[in-house]
Amino acid sequence: METDCSPMELTNNTESEEDSDYRDFEEADVKDMRLEAEAVVNDVLFAVSNMFVSKTLPCAEDVAYINVETRERGRYCVELTDSGLRVVAYDFDQTDDSLQNPYHETVYSLLDTLSPAYREVFGNALLQRLEALKRDSQS
């Protein structure tokens, strides 16, 4: 019977795979808030006038800042941390330490409180998706 590797090589390969899995687990444990912020922006950009991750304010493992302009033309700087999202200023690329706005668990909750137009656009998009699913299931 031919083998591609000896049993000793197989043992060494298994050990390196375990080490690799452990390293992947360690790396996955560390969050990059910039990536989280980009995902938030991509998720709801369709429902606001403008939204982007700040290039002026610092991003780190534990914090990122997102600039949001609602359809009503309200401008906000939003802080994203493990605690959630909260408005930290009423203009782009700013922070105001005197503001004590509450954290929201999701971007949907935050935008729901800031923008009635967001609520309408998001609700309409959801309705269209549900109607499309219904049509697909009937055909």
Curated annotation (Swiss-Prot):
Biological processes, Gene Ontology terms: regulation of canonical Wnt signaling pathway; regulation of Wnt signaling pathway
Molecular function terms, GO-annotated: kinase regulator activity; protein kinase A binding
Family: Belongs to the GSKIP family.
Keywords for the protein's UniProt record, in alphabetical order: Cytoplasm
Ranges for region Disordered: 1-23
Main localisation: cytoplasm
GO annotations of cellular component type: cytoplasm
Gene name of this polypeptide: GSKIP
Protein name per its UniProtKB record: GSK3-beta interaction protein
Subcellular location as annotated: Cytoplasm
